[in-house]
Each structure stands twice: as structure tokens, then as C-alpha cells.
């Protein structure tokens, strides 16, 4: 993997760059649609490529391990071929999913024992096991196995968890050397900075992570309930210490406003289920503000969904029609809204990149943050 910074903003810490892998170029800053089980909910791969123009999507190790399972993925030739996607893929290690299974998992030094949400069977994820699964999946970027702590989190637990994540990272790195890639191309391992909201722990963790000289680095354990200003504070602290010549990935973030604020702090990559999850509930993000398409006010509004939008659905369908689809509980409505929201998120990061290159990012961001917060 190669990463090149093409321009840094003079007034913020924002960067415009590009990541190059076997599966193509990823222009940064980038937002990555989440395709947990090998699909972005409600969106065809062709729409992701041609309309939304996603350079990279996510898959999830936990979910893909349970279904369709790694033997099927290996027979298919990896996840790229299984889902017919010839662009980049990043896989989460499953650490966050294990965190979310709090009542059905047990964490020990050797790994995590958890109960499948599908059939109740028990499984063990160790750093070594996760690396083997991620080799079978074949993502271009794969995450190290970590423990994601909740918020709030007691200091002592956060410290013990951070050190456990570091030890697990060392085991991930050691095991990867023994398990070569299965599909003929390099896979980059990104370690994950942890430490909850404690600045001293985050500093320890980021220094440890930076010392590994990985292809890129991730910031985990945020956007789990902490105040947004605390998220920004920790993100800035970590970005200031992480190597400048490696991409920085903030995991699980966030709203369109969060996206721009974190770009300004030096983040290059982000992902979140919000654009598709909120779309399925009738919330549309636009440059002028947020639309709840279920509201009665849109019942006879025959204007385009978003006259400034950048996907075909934005001007092809009207607000009144989309509201009707939601009222009738037609799945097409959720699909249209999902395409719109993802298209908006991808436009937002592309435009942020253009503004960074032009030297006008801060002025543009300030206006966008205000406008996008409106309720229409």
C-alpha cells in the first residue's frame, strides 16, 4: 500500500491525499460505506460504483466468519470475487461486535469467547484466529484485533484494556508473518489506538501504535456515547502524535458535521452505518440541512428529493413520492433514501478534498457545518 499527501490545509490540520492498493486508488479524505455482511444494505454494487462512486467499502470479520463462513469465501476466491467488487475493501476485526455482545462474551488474555447471535453456538476469537479469518476474507486493509471499551469506562479498566489491545496487536503482527496472503496481493494491517477518553492513556497507546510502523493507523473506542467535544479532543490529540506520512482512520464516525470536523483535525478515513441506517428511518442528509421525509409537510411537495444532489435518485424522484413509499412501507423508499445519503456523504468528502486543494477548506467548512445542522 502506498500513501501520498498531495496538499495540507494552511488553516486547519486537514490533508488531501491518496492511497494506492492492488484494487485501485482511494482519494482521501474518504468516507467508507459499511457492508457488514458483504453488502451495503439496500444498495447494489453497481450503484456503489457508478452513482455513489465509493472507492472502498467495509466488511466485518465477525459477521462474515459466522455467515457465509470462511470456507465459502476461500472457494469464491475471497470477498472481492464473492460480492463482485473490484475496488478496495477494509475489514473490521470484529472487536466492536464483540464489545456490543457484552452479555454473551467473555474476554481473557488468550482471546474472546462469544455466543453467536445467529444460532447460539460458542466461538473463540484470538488475535491469531482473527488474522487467519482476515486472510481468508482477503480485504486490502484489515484491522488488528482489539477490545473496544464502553463509555463511560472506569480508568483502571480502560488502562488494562489498552494494554491487552497492545499485546493482542503484537500477536497479530507475529502471526501474520506465518500466514501469507491467499489471493496474490498485499494486505495492510492497521493497528488501533485505544484508551477511552483518558488523555494519558491515549498518549501511551498512540505512541505504542506509532512505533509499529504500520501501513496506516486507526483510532478506535470513540463515538460510543461520549460528548462530541470530547471525541474531537481525543481525535486531535491522537492525530497530532500519529505519523504524518500514514493514513489515519477514525472508526465509526459519524454525522456529516462530525465528518468535516474530524477532517479538519487530520483524519483521512471514516466509516459509519448512519447514512444507511438513518435513511431506512426516513432521514435524509443534504447540504442545506436534514429532511425527515416522513413528515406530512412533504406529502404534496413535488420538487426533487435534492435538486443539488449527485446521484440519479435525487432528481429522478420527488419528495412526495418518497414520502408515499415510506408511508406505504415499500422497501424501494429505503433504497432510494440509502442511495441519496451515501451519495451525499461521498460528495461531502470529495468536496472537502477539493476545498483543501483550493485552500478554501475552513471557510467552506464553517458554512457547511451551519447549513447541514438545519432541520428542513
Locations of regions flagged by a protein language model:
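Glycine-rich phosphate/ribose-binding loops and adjacent secondary-structure elements
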Residues: 175, 179, 184-305
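Structural signal for hydrophobic packing residues in well-ordered secondary-structure cores
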Residues: 138, 169, 173-176, 180, ...
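Glycine- and acidic
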Residues: 151-155, 159, 216-222, 331-334
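Conserved, mostly hydrophobic/aromatic
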Residues: 24, 57, 92, 134, ...
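HAD-like aspartate-dependent phosphatase fold
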Residues: 92, 166, 218-220, 356
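A non-catalytic, amphipathic alpha-helix used as a structural packing/dimerization or gating element
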Residues: 129, 133, 137, 160, ...
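Non-catalytic, usually N-terminal nucleic-acid engagement modules in DNA/RNA processing proteins
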Residues: 1-182, 296-299
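C-terminal extensions of enzymes
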Residues: 1-18, 26-32, 41-42, 146-153, ...
